[in-house]
Amino acid sequence: MKKVVKVKDITIGEGMPKICIPILGETLEEIKEEAELLSTFDFDIVEWRADFFQFVEDMDCIKLAMEIIEENLGDKPMIFTLRSLKEGGKREVCEALYFEINRRVLETKNLDILDIELFHDKDEIESLINLAHKNGAKVIISNHDFQQTPSKDEILSRMNRAAQLGADIVKIAVMANDTEDVITVLDATRILKEDYLKIPLIAIAMGKKGMITRFAGEIFGSDITFATAKKTSAPGQLSVEDVKNIVQFIHKHTI
């Protein structure tokens, strides 16, 4: 029995891939501008990329930013993401601070979904997952490679490991340098959904060559896709209008 993840009015893991747009503001003013802009678009989930925020180590500023996003996009589930530099983030955050910030965000009890990177200390990850679930938040365990696409077996291994840690959703995003890389990601997505995972999956081949993976989730098994309203957070992201039109077209002609 496949599980879905229900957050607010959004069900992740069935139907069309849900569209997520990141907020990338460096200041409270920029976050407010982006949140107000996003409120005019039709999409499903907002991701706050807190690694872009200049005051990410100031908990009072983090709370203010979350309040601004909630005021403008309160009907949307929010993902809190503190992306590390090694996985494509904006700034370096030491291991201890990474977990401390994520813990304090969860303790606000005002978060829907937390993104935790796979390649951190296992015990710390499990502790954070337990805290998230205690405070009513879902967890994405993610892995990103902005240089290459690992082998199919390695993708399967990483996502199975993420699921075994207790994730509600697992995510893999890798760089596609050629069409073979794209096929590797699509087939790994198919295998994970058909043979391994009972939870929602996000699978993306980044870059222009991997663009098809952002649209074909309903066919191959990826449950969330990322789009942009302003700035991009990863190579190959397209506008929310383009993504929505193509995802809806595929849905219409595959059901």
Swiss-Prot record:
PANTHER family: 3-DEHYDROQUINATE DEHYDRATASE. Belongs to the type-I 3-dehydroquinase family. This is 3-dehydroquinate dehydratase. Coiled coil: none annotated. Disulfide bonds: none annotated. The keyword Plastid does not apply. GO terms for molecular function: 3-dehydroquinate dehydratase activity. Involved in the third step of the chorismate pathway, which leads to the biosynthesis of aromatic amino acids. Catalyzes the cis-dehydration of 3-dehydroquinate (DHQ) and introduces the first double bond of the aromatic ring to yield 3-dehydroshikimate. It is an enzyme of class 4 (lyase). Its EC number is 4.2.1.10. The active site is at H144 (proton donor/acceptor), K171 (schiff-base intermediate with substrate). HAMAP family: AroD (MF_00214). Pathway: Metabolic intermediate biosynthesis; chorismate biosynthesis; chorismate from D-erythrose 4-phosphate and phosphoenolpyruvate: step 3/7. InterPro entries: 3-dehydroquinate_DH_AS, Aldolase_TIM, DHquinase_I, Type-I_3-dehydroquinase. One of its GO terms (biological process) is chorismate biosynthetic process. It comes from Alkaliphilus oremlandii (strain OhILAs). NCBIfam families: aroD.
